[in-house]
């Protein structure tokens, strides 16, 4: 009797194992399918974003169509549109309307920038309009004399910069830059290109600060496309990874990883000194004060000698221009009175209008950016003093009494502290 019970038990066991195996296999297949589906969806979304951000072919087509019909001209036009010796390389764009690429022009490395919309002066958190072909490169019109063009440029500078410095001298400098073929005359095509470029704060700043060490040099232009001096390292810190890998790295871990991939401390100190010197360059220069409205690591770079070079200056704007445009803006709170990420004014609750005074100066924003960058790995003998000076710097307010004196004192003290520590090191 006992023997007759065994076969049934023996038969039931494989069914149980088979059912369990099928369940495990189905679960495995389901999760495998889910991972593939989610991964494919993420890659598709990111690829779509990439193709939207990186529209170099569209930019080139628009510019070259205008050049070949004689509307615009400039030193980069022939290389871009005829000989094709100006190449677009790695895409660095962060917004579809501001195209940015590493490029090669006649075997020289550079950074190519192109606008994909009608250039507007300032944007307070709204999307810029799509590029309007009807009005692009519409000024100056045919028949405009050189003198009339100079008057147009002078009026534009007065609106942007106020009565700062010798504007007539700046106008003459612009005409020299606009004369791309250096024949002593500015053609209508060159004038149209120059006028379009002058609507861009970055181009204006490059011309004003063309002799300064930390401002990239202008290599050439065609329409509102322009080529800047190349920068070896296009971010203050971090490591460049393929975007597919970036998807799977948590933001907190990414920030920690960025801080690991930085130069040695003496080299970081030299780069930091460069940023402080750039702050000096834009603080009450010959044409007034310029405000840094997006002080982030991605906008700063450095060369192989660890000299700071600005990578993106599009959110550095003339103070006069910003004040004029923001002062009567309707607001509910201080959050409505922001340009870029860093330029903040306050909301006057009695009038529900933004005030014109920016709260935080450039130096305070630069020190905020440099705090973690410099304190990590700082030599123990200066760490306490460095931390103290950085926090004093961050606390600077535009409205403080004797702000300019404090600004100069803090800036000079910081530079002196850093220089003394790195003057005799090989790394610097």
From Swiss-Prot:
Name of protein: Divergent protein kinase domain 1A
Topology with respect to the bilayer: Single-pass type II membrane protein
UniProt keyword Transmembrane helix present: yes
Gene that this polypeptide is encoded by: DIPK1A
Phylogenetic classification of the source organism: Eukaryota, Metazoa, Chordata, Craniata, Vertebrata
Post-translational modification: Among the many cysteines in the lumenal domain, most are probably involved in disulfide bonds.
SMART domains in UniProt: PIP49_N
Compartment(s): Endoplasmic reticulum membrane
InterPro entries xref list: FAM69_kinase_dom (IPR022049), FAM69_N (IPR029244)
